[in-house]
Regions:
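Charge-rich, low-complexity intrinsically disordered regions
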Residues: 1-190
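Solvent-exposed, low-complexity segments and loops of surface/extracellular structural proteins
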Residues: 1, 141, 146, 180-277
Length: 277
């Protein structure tokens, strides 16, 4: 599988490492361990990492380069969708837009490729599409405008970011090598999201996560399960984790309702004698 210009192997692996370290801090993830895990599953080198991105990474919101950020893209799309200033977009608006996108079978990267770039939505605070299009029009000269450049890029089946990463510095009609186009400070969207840890109780719990990477802990308390029938957990957006210990404190199987939680870890324990049946 050929590796496209938008895919930066080192950046992707660094971002993936951060994701697994956040999801499982006790696992002792290192870059060497991650690369070994990739290789054991058939994802070797840059081509293998790109294959992993296509199969898993995009859906996990792991950025393939330094100029894309899933959280910032969702925020930029929300600002455009609701018609508000980028700095004024709220977490509720961001979460709602992300829900719309994911419920239609897309993620930040695939939505940007299919729709966002053509709509003029920035892929992150690190890349101002309008600034790049204006600079590219100047480099082209001879009556070119930013609008004409945008149409030409779209007509060639590319996003603005892909065009920049593939062609910057490659010819006299291109922008200079190493030129960057960060979003102005007063037009940046919020770059961080709230992540929360929730502890379940021995009562009935109904918990909804944030758009961040939330953790739900359901540990045994006073010899009782805290994850039990009647509990409802909705992780919401982000890469969420449920840690649950289950003991034999009830006569019936626990049947909680769980959705939008990406990682679920169960530990089961029992202290009952075998009755021979």
């Amino acid at each position: 599988m050929a590796t496209p210009a938008f895919f930066d192997y080192e950046t992707y692996m660094t971002n993936k490492l951060a994701q697994v370290q956040n999801a499982d801090p006790a696992a002792g993830w290192t870059m060497t361990k991650l690369m070994d895990s990739f290789a054991q599953n058939g994802f070797v080198g840059a081509d293998g990492a790109y294959a992993h991105f296509v199969q898993f990474g995009a859906a996990e919101e792991i950025a393939p380069n330094a100029d894309f950020n899933a959280n910032e893209y969702y925020a930029a799309k929300a600002a455009q969708f609701y018609g508000v200033e980028p700095k004024a977009v709220t977490e509720f608006q961001i979460a709602n837009v992300k829900q719309i996108i994911t419920s239609n079978g897309m993620n930040a990267w695939t939505h940007y490729q299919q729709f966002g770039s053509a709509e003029g939505v920035n892929p992150s605070n690190a890349f101002d599409a309008d600034a790049y299009l204006a600079a590219k029009a100047v480099a082209m000269g001879d009556g070119w405008t930013a609008e004409k450049v945008a149409e030409a890029i779209k007509g060639n089946g590319m996003t603005v970011l892909e065009h920049y990463l593939q062609y910057a510095g490659t010819g006299e009609n291109e922008v200079a090598k190493g030129a960057t186009y960060p979003v102005p400070d007063d037009q940046k969207v919020p770059s961080s999201v709230t992540s929360t840890t929730y502890d379940l109780t021995v009562g009935q719990d109904s918990l909804s996560g944030t758009i961040g990477n939330d953790t739900f802990n359901a540990f045994i308390f006073d010899n009782q399960n805290t994850l039990q029938s009647g509990d409802r957990i909705d992780g919401g957006a982000g890469h969420d984790v449920l840690n649950a210990d289950l003991g034999t404190s009830a006569l019936f199987a626990a049947t909680p309702e769980i959705k939008n939680v990406e990682v679920i870890k169960f530990r089961a324990q029992a202290n009952a004698a075998d009755n021979g049946s």
